[in-house]
Every structure is written in structure tokens, then in C-alpha cells.
């Protein structure tokens, strides 16, 4: 929303195209994506429930977080949902805020851990390794000349990346299930250096 309303750029932990397989793995069978634009931003919370959730999607159950806010100027909350649906046969499930010994689990906390290069604790919160994709672009070929082919990756500018440094990583090529043990250098020009090479690694190195 802040990108649309205030032209603010916020790097994302998961790009839209990355969320789909994650949701599928969680058991989501159907997904309706509603693009957020200025017209939608002016829709009141009550009208969002009536026009979209009830009339369009014919919702029978609504699940939201305990601190959920929505609608024009974030005016809607759980009580808004209760009042608007009180005469309808719609179930409301409220998801408690998740916490651990370190405090509230949130995307801001994950970003902070990644910025500090603390991928182990980020993994514990996400329950999966943090990953990203890139397009191989031509490099100087120095690694290949030394016997260690490297893939110079151009990363989507919308993606949040861990802090600069050198990481042990697993790489895959074109969604292959074959994982390649790698050393990844994240800097102003992120690269992946393949430790264990193959014909495919040689082919895609630059």
C-alpha cells in the first residue's frame, strides 16, 4: 500500500511470484489476488467486506490476525468484521500474534536478522531457508580461468537481500531439484561461486 499511496519503495521478503508456491505448500487450494490501487485504497472497511468478501467471493469464513487493520485509512478492525457480518452465517477466526523467547515474530524482525547476516535465526522464524533467484549475466570470467566457474547474478531490485558478505549456499539451475554446493558473495554486484562444478555449471558461468 505505501508504494501506491506514497511512492515508497519497500524491499520484499517474498516477491508475488515467490509467494504462490509457498502458499500452495501450506495447503491453499484457491487464491484470489486483488491488486491494490488508489481506488481500492478509498474503499471503506464495511464496503470491502460487503462488496468483495461477501458479494464477489461469497466468503463463509474469515481468518485474520489479532491486530489486523484494513479499509480506508486502516479504519477497519476485528470489531468492524463482527458488526458487518453479525446477521450473516459467516465464521470469524482470529489468529493470535506469534511470539517466541525473543519477542514478536514479524517481517520487520526477519529483515533485521537478514541485514545482520543472521540467517540461522531467520530460518527459525521462516521455517525455511531464505532464498532468491537471479538472472545470470556476463562477468569477467576470472573465476572460470582459475578453475572455479562463477555465476554473476542480477537480482530483482524489489527483493530484500541479506547483509553484504560471503555465505555458504545451495544453488539450483532453472528450478532443477539438483542442488549445487556454492559459495555466495553478496556485495554491490552479487555473485554465486560454484564450489562443485558440473557441465551445467560451466555452461551457465560467466
Where are these regions (language model features)?
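Short secondary-structure boundary segments
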Residues: 35, 66, 186-188
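Hydrophobic pocket-lining residues within nucleotide cofactor-binding pockets
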Residues: 36, 97-98, 200-201
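Core alpha/beta nucleotide-donor-binding catalytic domains of modification enzymes
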Residues: 1-57
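A residue-level signal for conserved active-site and pocket-lining positions in enzyme catalytic cores
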Residues: 23, 122, 169
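Flexible, glycine-rich phosphate/dinucleotide-binding loops
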Residues: 2-3, 101, 206
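Phosphate/ribose-recognition catalytic cores of enzymes acting on nucleotide-derived substrates
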Residues: 139-198, 205
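Classical nucleotidyltransferase
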Residues: 42-149, 164
